[in-house]
Amino acid sequence: MSGPTWLPPKQPEPARAPQGRAIPRGTPGPPPAHGAALQPHPRVNFCPLPSEQCYQAPGGPEDRGPAWVGSHGVLQHTQGLPADRGGLRPGSLDAEIDLLSSTLAELNGGRGHASRRPDRQAYEPPPPPAYRTGSLKPNPASPLPASPYGGPTPASYTTASTPAGPAFPVQVKVAQPVRGCGPPRRGASQASGPLPGPHFPLPGRGEVWGPGYRSQREPGPGAKEEAAGVSGPAGRGRGGEHGPQVPLSQPPEDELDRLTKKLVHDMNHPPSGEYFGQCGGCGEDVVGDGAGVVALDRVFHVGCFVCSTCRAQLRGQHFYAVERRAYCEGCYVATLEKCATCSQPILDRILRAMGKAYHPGCFTCVVCHRGLDGIPFTVDATSQIHCIEDFHRKFAPRCSVCGGAIMPEPGQEETVRIVALDRSFHIGCYKCEECGLLLSSEGECQGCYPLDGHILCKACSAWRIQELSATVTTDC
């Protein structure tokens, strides 16, 4: 890259004059106060920068100085010389491309670059943006309103007569190449704050920018061509993206096959008012009067309602339902339990006792033949069933006095008896054999004093002992 070359100073000034800001207004005016007059100098060609690009106005050799493009694409001149507004012809394609490139580079440029001196600028120009040659339209440069501050201000390039001193700083913005972001709209007014960041349009909803930098929402010559590459609301943008998805209709062959099957099914199964439902045996429809049988809360064909064992038809016959299965009477009886007393099948209630099944009328006492349904009973050693009374009468111990069976008292379940001399006695039969005194097994006075196999009280037992002693003495 090449920088600006300057002529050696001819008239150096010993004094330094303050430099002011050069305001390019585009109108001729007095030369800036630098303490020395401007000297003619040869034409200087500046290297193109991302934010400031120099153009040679086509006005002829009488052009006063190098022109440069400031922020927002307005052609300006340095050294306070008037800007040639008509120098950039609307029909010039190259000038329009450079103007758009500089605007894109400056407004999309990176932020935070430090200000550099104009004599130390060395940058590579960014690649020109993609454009369409067929849709370029001349855009007249809008005049920049004067503002007290804001934006990059061009430096006053001094000639040989300018004293050597600190040059006015020039703010240079370098554009950073950003992929996927569209340039902002032209015509934005210059503000004092920092430039806005790059605009990233949302895919499918953002603005599509064409070579003329027109939005789809703005009516213009290039809007129609750009909108052709964007589908409707349901579609996506360009670049190999998806379009609106249209549901595919069913092939005619499949539709015809489906209609044919439906027609055949309707012909084989015509709707009828005599339809009763599906058969519980075969699962087919029961249609027609007299063709079905209702049983077990279901509908059966006449030929399907048969016995589950012998397969005999049960229409008009008695049948037995066991676990939702139908049985004829013979097959049902064969499956029943037999009574342990009469050996007949039990068709009604079953009375179970000691692991056997009985008819309620067959479960009786073997002595009195009374039914024992709900009555306590007992069995003997041969598994004969007895009621409690008959069992005690038959198997209870006998009293040695009266000879009767010793049985429990009414309302009692236990039998109370007195055993003495290996004999059993009722409580009321346990008396002294001499005087008839009621003996007791607990009292000492009324206790039993047996003598020679007799039950005697204490007094009677003593009298008998004395009597026997006297007899023995007399015999001696």
Curated annotation (Swiss-Prot):
Residues 469-476 are annotated as: Interaction with MAGI1 and PTPN13. The modification Asymmetric dimethylarginine is found at R25. SMART domains: LIM. Keywords: Cell adhesion, Cell junction, Cytoplasm, Cytoskeleton, LIM domain, Metal-binding, Methylation, Nucleus, Phosphoprotein, Repeat, Transcription, Transcription regulation, Zinc. It is found in: Cytoplasm, Cytoskeleton; Cell junction, Focal adhesion; Nucleus; Cytoplasm. Changing S102A: Exclusively located in nucleus. The modification Phosphoserine is found at S92, S142, S189, S249. Phosphorylation at Tyr-55 by SRC is required for enhancement of lysophosphatidic acid-induced cell migration. Tyr-55 is dephosphorylated by PTPN13. The modification Omega-N-methylarginine is found at R25, R111, R179, R186, R205, R236, R238. Residues 1-93, 108-253 are annotated as: Disordered. One of its GO terms (cellular component) is stress fiber. The modification Phosphotyrosine is found at Y55. Residues 152-167 have a biased composition (Low complexity). Abundantly expressed in kidney, liver and lung. Lower levels in heart, placenta and pancreas. Expressed in colonic epithelial cells. Up-regulated in colonic tumors. Specifically interacts with the ligand binding domain of the thyroid receptor (TR) in the presence of thyroid hormone. Interacts (via the third LIM domain and C-terminus) with PTPN13 (via the second PDZ domain). Interacts (via the second LIM domain or via the third LIM domain plus C-terminus) with PDLIM4 (via PDZ domain). Found in a complex with PTPN13 and PDLIM4. Interacts with SVIL isoform 2. Interacts with LPAR2 but not other LPA receptors. Interacts with PRKAA2. Interacts with MAGI1. Interacts with SCRIB. In case of infection, interacts with S.typhimurium protein sseI. Relays signals from the cell surface to the nucleus to weaken adherens junction and promote actin cytoskeleton reorganization and cell invasiveness. Involved in lysophosphatidic acid-induced cell adhesion and migration. Acts as a transcriptional coactivator for NF-kappa-B and JUN, and mediates the transrepression of these transcription factors induced by glucocorticoid receptor. Belongs to the zyxin/ajuba family. The LIM zinc-binding domains mediate interaction with LPAR2 and with S.typhimurium protein sseI. This is Thyroid receptor-interacting protein 6. The lineage of its organism: Eukaryota, Metazoa, Chordata, Craniata, Vertebrata. The gene is TRIP6.
